[in-house]
Amino acid sequence: MLPSTSLNSSMYGNGALNSRDAARHTAGAKRYKYLRRLFRFRQMDFEFAAWQMLYLFTSPQRVYRNFHYRKQTKDQWARDDPAFLVLLSIWLCVSTIGFGFVLDMGFFETIKLLLWVVFIDCVGVGLLISTLMWFISNKYLVKRQSRDYDVEWGYAFDVHLNAFYPLLVILHFIQLFFINHVILTDTFIGYLVGNTLWLIAVGYYIYVTFLGYSALPFLKNTVVLLYPFAPLIVLYGLSLALGWNFTHTLCSFYKYRVK
């Protein structure tokens, strides 16, 4: 079972809900409603989800302003429409098949890679990161320890999805066009291009994650979420100095998985 969170009150944590509202808006009820809509495609707003994906690249702050609007109108920070998750899953499947093609994998090897990437890299790691950030934000970043000031687990998961999408596009789509003819050529230009794409992708993940938690008015010191930029830049510099090609390591790992 996913960790549950206490109910946030009205906008910015002020006020209190009556018992009937609280029962209707428990974490379990929200989760059930979300999962139920996961199989009702006609009820999903794919146009709005696609709009969010676009703005995650051009203006991610606008995406989180919509989360504020949802809190005002539906009394929850997390998405109640799984359309974004569905589109992200489609992107992940298509790009992973592309990876299998670029790495010259057979049909069954590509299917095996797809299962690994979807259920372990995306779902498994995503649940782990979301739970970790949910715990850290509630334990250390909340301004006032109260049941009225609580980061929803669903919101932590949404922040991860928001940050994961640009990383996915950069590393699993854009990078595909450079792997065989540039990145894996065992030259300085090769690992410069590849590692720079990794720097941009992971850096964007950190930045979008920071924006997600800094958008919550009851959190403090969210700037600490930008601190991973320092070791990231150091690692990038060391990789260029040592000739360590991140993409080559990823491709070798993918091939090892499907043996």
UniProtKB/Swiss-Prot annotation:
The chain crosses the membrane at residues 83-103, 116-136, 164-184, 188-208, 223-243. Involved in the cell surface expression of neuronal nicotinic receptors. Binds RNA. The keyword Membrane applies. Signal peptide: none annotated. The keyword Coiled coil does not apply. Residues 104-115, 185-187, 244-259 are lumenal. It comes from Rattus norvegicus. PANTHER family: PROTEIN UNC-50 HOMOLOG (PTHR12841:SF6). One of its GO terms (molecular function) is RNA binding. Keywords: Acetylation, Golgi apparatus, Membrane, Nucleus, Phosphoprotein, RNA-binding, Transmembrane, Transmembrane helix. It is found in: Nucleus inner membrane; Golgi apparatus membrane. Expressed in brain, kidney and testis, and at lower levels in heart. Pfam families: UNC-50. This is Protein unc-50 homolog.
